[in-house]
Design a protein with these regions (language model features):
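Glycine-rich phosphate-binding loop plus the immediately following alpha-helix
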Residues: 158-189, 328-351, 356-365, 421, ...
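Conserved phosphate/anionic-ligand binding catalytic regions in large, soluble enzymes, centered on
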Residues: 38-58, 145-148, 234, 238-250, ...
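Gly/Ser/Thr-enriched, mixed-charge loops and adjacent short helices
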Residues: 33-42, 153-285, 291-293
Length: 575
């Protein structure tokens, strides 16, 4: 694609607003900036689109939203009149322009004769997954950007099971988008006109009530919560986002009496004024929550990201300071707790199964299998876990009780097929209250699990490579690792190499080649002589290579020393 030609097309298009035209005028003498915005469209994948909000083909803006929706509408229409009648559910988060983008998507769907159910205001991502399933929709559209900085927005698409789009449908949309002109190929209908004609209807409190009835049905142990409710306290922050209403509702339904919200961060604001990045993975964002917790003698802090699909926790250690609990650790804590709680309450099904991703700690497998629960791996992303859950349950092979990935996402219950911070927040709080009744904090509980199951440690390194040069550097790094694979890492021999692109496995000791069940994802895996596993993959949503170190040792010091040692090799990868 000729980026200057594309720039000129946009610059002279009457579809642009005066503000958008002025924005393009301001970069006319900056060929590098023009190239970064117009060298090609954002890639439409199974996660949809995500990018920075600027005027340009490679950015998130109303023209790209309409164009993507036209492609999606064509795929929905291919299902016939029944698919159009079942329609699409649409949701949005707190970000700047999210409501505008969601309404624009609704207008395009309506113009294509597709019935639309759109939320009246921002809602948690899991509620969109729920709505697709609850109302029998053909598809779903969400306009969030999860935990990304304020400059970002996104466009996530779902299919009829409430999970993100399967690859063959994503490919069909991508192919269709190649044929659609971004300005002239899109159908549009006025929003209010579509409402009057019955093509668009809004969802609100009634859907909230239905969703929350399913969430609260997941409570295992109200009795223990009631025993400690007069003294148990927690601090909660939604980081200016969608969790502000339903997470407190869920905790109140659980029986929590002393929920202390962070007032500054309960304010909905797409600029996220109190944090650099609204990411519960980043401890820095919890500074207000920590101050509040110390003032109120609280041991447990809970934070959900802006679209309320991911949740992070912080706990007070024995020195009285708050420390983050990683997604890997949180998942292990919750899995171990749920197994016990479900057994105690009689809720444990026959043939229970836990799901995790290939980059998630092996400690989860140890916890599951030690307690009679099978554990299966999937690729990164809840669409793959939803797919595996559906397959296991439809075949009668197993009943999934918990699915999680290390990046702070947890899926529970049968009413959603995506990560769900509302339900997870409630069950994490139930778990914290249960341990409180045993005279333990979650810091104590985590150390008890290490003593019981082994000292595992994990670290994710993000090699950020922004811009067009970054995309090239990312591709080159993956190519170099395939063409010149390491024989040792930080002085320790690589004994097995796996490439998830084609499912190939090479035994580096014997030279034997074999195949694994999983294939079709750009991930490399190195298994080392000391039991450490290192995985390398490009992020699907951000300009960075992610490197995961999964290790264990005789104790905490030994496992942390391994993280440090292998981290030096990772740091040297960045160009």
């Amino acid at each position: 694609m000729d980026f200057m030609q594309e720039y000129e097309k946009w610059f002279h298009s009457p579809a642009l607003s005066p503000e958008e035209h002025a924005e393009l005028e301001s970069i006319k003498d900056d060929p590098k900036e023009i190239e970064s915005r117009f060298f090609g469209p954002l890639e439409f994948g199974t996660a949809g689109l995500r990018g920075t909000m600027y005027t340009g083909l490679h950015n998130m803006n109303i023209h790209v939203i309409r164009w993507a929706t036209q492609g999606f509408a064509d795929v929905i229409a291919a299902e016939g009149e029944e698919g159009k009648r079942r329609g699409v559910a649409i949701c949005m988060d707190c970000r700047n322009h999210s409501m505008e983008f969601a309404r624009a998507a609704a207008e395009v769907c309506a113009a294509n004769g597709i019935h639309v159910r759109i939320f009246d205001s921002l809602r948690p991502t899991p509620e969109l997954s729920f709505a697709v399933r609850e109302y029998g929709c053909q598809a779903g559209i969400n306009v969030p950007a999860s935990h990304n900085p304020k400059e970002y927005n996104g466009y996530k698409v779902y299919w009829s099971d409430g999970a993100q789009l399967p690859p063959h449908h994503a490919d069909a949309i991508a192919k269709r988008l190649e044929e659609i002109d971004i300005f002239d190929g899109v159908k549009r209908m006025d929003f209010e006109e579509a409402v009057k004609s019955g093509l668009i209807e809004t969802m609100g409190d009634e859907t909230d009530r239905k969703f929350m009835a399913n969430v609260t049905a997941m409570i295992n142990d109200r009795e223990t919560v009631a025993k400690v409710a007069d003294t148990f306290k927690l601090v909660y922050t939604p980081f200016h986002g969608c969790g502000y209403k339903l997470v407190p509702e869920a905790l109140t339904a659980l029986g929590i009496k002393h929920l202390i919200p962070v007032p500054e961060q309960m304010v909905i604001d797409g600029n996220f004024p109190t944090v650099v990045s609204p990411n519960p993975e980043n401890p820095e964002g919890f500074y207000l929550a920590i101050d509040l917790a110390k003032k109120n003698d609280v041991d447990f802090i809970l934070g959900t990201d802006p679209d309320s699909d991911r949740v992070g926790i912080m706990v007070r250690n024995h020195e009285g300071e708050f420390q983050p609990v990683t997604g890997n650790q949180t998942g292990v804590l919750l899995l171990d707790y749920l197994i016990g709680a479900m057994k105690r309450s009689g809720k444990m099904p026959a043939n229970p199964v836990a799901l995790k991703t290939i980059v998630t700690t092996e400690m989860a497998r140890k916890v599951a299998e030690s307690n009679g629960v099978k554990c299966f791996d999937t690729f990164t992303g809840f669409k793959f876990m939803a797919e595996k859950k559906n397959a296991l349950e439809e075949s009668g092979e197993g009943k999934v009780i918990f699915s999680y990935e290390e990046s702070y996402g947890y899926m529970l219950g049968d009413y959603v097929r995506d990560k769900d911070a509302v339900t997870a927040s409630m069950l994490l709080t139930e778990m914290a209250a249960w341990y409180d009744a045993q005279g333990m904090t979650l810091f104590d509980a985590l150390n008890a699990l290490y003593e019981k199951y082994g000292w595992y440690a994990e670290k994710t390194h993000n090699l950020v490579m922004p811009g067009l040069d970054g995309l090239r550097d990312m591709a080159k790094l993956m190519k170099d690792l395939r063409e010149n694979p390491p024989t040792e890492i930080s002085g320790v021999k690589v004994i097995v190499r796996k490439d998830y692109t084609d499912g190939s496995v090479i035994d580096c000791v014997t030279g034997a080649k074999s195949r694994m069940e999983l294939s079709g994802s750009n991930v490399l895996r190195y298994e080392l002589e000391d039991g450490t596993v290192i995985l390398v993959r490009p992020s699907g949503t951000e300009p960075k290579i992610k490197v995961y170190i999964l290790t264990q040792g005789a104790d905490a010091a030994a496992s942390n020393a391994n993280l440090e040692k292998y981290g030096q090799w990772v740091a040297a990868l960045k160009p």
